Amino acid sequence: MKNQKLTFLFVLALALTGCNLVSSTISSNASFNNDSSTKSSSSICEHDFVYDSDANDAPTIIQSQGAKYVCNKCGAEKYENASYDLNEYEFVDQSYLYDGNEHQLTIRGMIPYGCTVEYENNSLKEIGEKEATARVYDEKHQLVDLKKAKIHIIENTGMPNIRIDTNNKPVESKETYVPMTLSTDNCNDKYKLNDAPGEIRCRGNGTMTYDKKPYRIKFTSKTNMLGLNHGSKAKSWVLLAEYADQSMVRNATAFYLGNSLFNYSDNYCSDYMPVNVYLNGKYNGVYVLAEQQQANSNRIKINEAEKNDTSTDVGYLIELDSRASEEDYYFSVGKGTDWSMFPGGGWGGNAEQPDKLDGVSLYRKDYAVKTDVYSQDQVNYIKKYLTNVYYAFYKAVHGDGLFVLDDNNELVASPYTTQFETLNSIIDLESVFKMYLLHEYMKDVDVGFGSFYMFVDFSTTSKYKRLTFGAPWDFDWSSGNVNTSECYGSSGEYCSKSQGNFNPWFFMLSRTDFFKSMFKKYYSVFKNSQILEGAIAQANYFAAAFKNDYVKNYQKWDNLGKITPKYTPDIARTFKSHQDAVDYLTKWLTDRKKSLDQIFK
């Protein structure tokens, strides 16, 4: 994990154990005493400055503003000891295929609160390269960071090709792997594979019911695919079919947002790339190549149990998953069953009453253990841990007192006096806020149903001592590609509402006393970083640069402009081209931003 720093800047220093080491600090020359009494400084005006507790009591993890002072006569503002985290973003070389459009580089990640970016020499249209400059300025337009990177535009030969050979054996099962060899071409020579051995099977849940199947690849030895994740190697990779999403870029859009939010800390979001897939010599369409959701030193960095290790002090990857009972190891957290989730409205006599919050029932949820398990003790251990973290959260927002977990994962009285300090000592709240922000933007229909990941590591070398949320996944039914009333439209709050498959963790977060002020800060940083604009630019680039590949895909599958079970909205019937589907998505995202700008202004 990055070096951490506990900085006691007035009441902002709330033992934020998730704070990253700041790499640059900008302080004013004026000197103020760090208490709540009246301050004065002739450097701004002759009036008295009063410590603004409303501005400072709302904790912010992304960037510490320092203490804010406001003149109670003229309204002038003063920040003392502001510090900026310059580790949450990057400005790196980027290659584009020639598509006739201008291309620019942007800083990728979270630009510190209050900072702005100015670019120089940052536009290229024709084949060639150019070095661009990005300058980051603070609120006083003082330079705090300078980065350079190159734009490359190269000849457009379409998507990379992945060629899979199973010796003509069919790939039809989720349970049974089929031996294969895999080759890649139409890519940089250093990324070419020639008959790499391994296995392949189908994957997915609802997506398995479609004609175009998604796949999981498992190489015999660790292998990199097409340079993803900085060239890191792993055995397991996935090919997402994107059959239910006629834009075929919703997962790529969510991955862009997730990488911008998570991948400059020790959290994780999959890398990705659109590719053409050939199976036994036959074209099988456009897929998105992505990384398997797993414990790995270059993916989710938890210390998974070694083979036959039955100890409990290991790392655990957990998925909130309504189909968890289909997994080898799973457990439930919470009370009561929402029988409306089942066909026919339910059965049996489960009389257990669910917990309630603001009059809303928080029904029991199932969780699958996605890391290797070698004893029932391990399952019991992580179940007890997650159950008590959940109830510490619930009790805090329900008004039942503040609790933390002891060394035996039992609930005990919190040593802290605030909700934030208490919850942040057992949950990485920064990770929860970032996941909340991503799902709030995308309106993912399955946010409380499945493909929702969290992890914790009890080993001595753990990077995740607290419960951490991350590894966002599965967004084909999101961002307007859903026929339910709560997900189809681009307006209104989503994760804080008790609608559809709502997520109990997000619902509880939205009821904390620090949520409103803190989320506005995260949203402000997200907005200022122009992350959504980058995701929209990516969607448009894919549509233009790979136009011929998408045309070929729809010639193969002929599902454009048709309704795919189970959520496709009627507007999909109007799509005459792949570009139509992309235009609908980018307009929805733009409108979503306008709505959230008003809600969280």
Describe every region a protein language model picked out.
Residues 82-111:
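Solvent-exposed, low-complexity, repeat-rich "mucin-like" stalks and linkers
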Residues 91, 147, 153-253:
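Conserved NTP-binding catalytic cores of kinases and kinase-like/nucleotidyltransferase enzymes
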Residues 49-70, 111-153:
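Serine/threonine-rich, repeat-prone extracellular segments and beta-strand-based repeat modules
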Residues 170, 196, 204-206, 210, ...:
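Middle-to-C-terminal accessory/interaction subdomains
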Residues 223-224, 234-243, 265-268, 283-434:
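Internal "kinase-insert"/substrate-recognition segments embedded within catalytic cores
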Residues 261-276, 444:
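Short, well-structured beta-strand/strand-turn elements
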